[in-house]
Each structure stands twice: as C-alpha cells, then as structure tokens.
Amino acid sequence: MNKDLLRRMSEVAPGTFQHSIQVGNLAAEIARKIGGNPQLVRTGALYHDIGKMQNPIYFTENQSGGISPHDTLTYIESAQMIVSHVTEGLKLADKYNLPVQIRDLIATHHGLGKAKYFYIKYKNEYPDQPIDELLFTYPGPNPFTKEQAILMMADGVEAASRSLPDYTEQSIRQLVNKLIDGMNDDGYFRDCPITYRDIQYAKTVLIEKLKTIYHTRISYPEMNETSNAK
C-alpha cells in the first residue's frame, strides 16, 4: 500500500482523512461480526475517498467558516464535482498501483447512487424541466462483495451522523435504520453475497459504535420533588 498517498490526504484533505479512519473502524467491526475480511475493508476505507484530494474544499468535511464553494455553482455542476471523486480516486488507484480489491472498493462505495442533496434541490427548483439523471449519478458499479457492501454502509452512516442535530440513542437508531434500509430498498446489495441477517447485524454494530463515539447515554426521567421526598 502507499503510505505517501495517505500522508498527502491527511495534509490536503484532513477532514476526509479523519472520516476515512472512522469509516475503517466501523467497517472492520461489522466485518468481524458478519464474516467479512476486517483488514481488507479497513484498508479500503482508508483509500476509498482519495479522489477528494483533487478538490477537497468541495466536500463538507474539509470546509470551515460556513463558506461553501458550491454557492457559486449550479446544482448540476455541484453534483458533477461530488460524483467525480470516485473517478478521480480510480485514476489515483491506477497511478499508484493499488491492489484491484482496493480499486473495487473505491469504485463501489457509492454504487449507482445519486448526489442526492443536489439532485433533490434541482428537482424541487425546476419541477417542470426534464432532468438527465446520469449527471447526478455515481459511475458505480453497485457492491458485488460483502466487504464492498460493508464499506458502503459504514461510509454512508458515518458521514450522515456528523449532521445529526443531537446525539441520542433514538436519533442514532433512526438514522442508521433509515440509511441502511434505504440502501437495501434501492437494490444496492442485490449483486453481493450479503444476507438480510447480515444487514441487521451491521445495523446493530453501527448503532452501538456510534453511541460509543458520541458518548450517548440512556436518559432517565428526573424524579419530581414529591417522589424525592418519599
């Protein structure tokens, strides 16, 4: 593997680098639980977003001060910038001769999904205009190994968890269930050997790990003065 590439990412896209480490931790834990390869998926997680180094400021984890360069772009231009990190990552994988298993993890971590934020924004603002779906769609393919499905789940959940308004057990559980069930319903896992039971175990791991990361505790109701007096 290429440590210089990771060092460069830590310098030019520090938010992405930290995200990748967290994704690796989550993914490895899921792999241990459902019989995947923890080392492969952890390594793949470290490299899955290397394409973001080409334009790091366009990704929220590398932004600060509330200023976004997307404010100067159209929704289509923004979507193209977002989805391009997969193809840019594959170019770097080829340039640095990364193993094919890592290359495949880069290619599949968004599957054939869409840059949903900008896709929805466009559809809401221009409801009567025809839309070229491909302009908002990642190149794929969808995951075709268990490790690729694990990485997709861990990546999506870790990224979304950073936008939660509050970190309670309920909010974390709702987030994980919504995201993973959505991926399954959209058919992202149809081409890989992962079972319904595997997916439920993955959700449990993600919920428990995120609770630990964000130090959530079950909140107990406070006793009123009358109860305290008894």
Give short role names for the model-derived ranges.
Residues 6-19, 24-169, 173-176, 182-186:
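Divalent metal-dependent catalytic cores for phosphoryl transfer on phosphate-bearing substrates
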Residues 1, 9-12, 24-27, 154, ...:
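Long, compositionally biased intrinsically disordered regions
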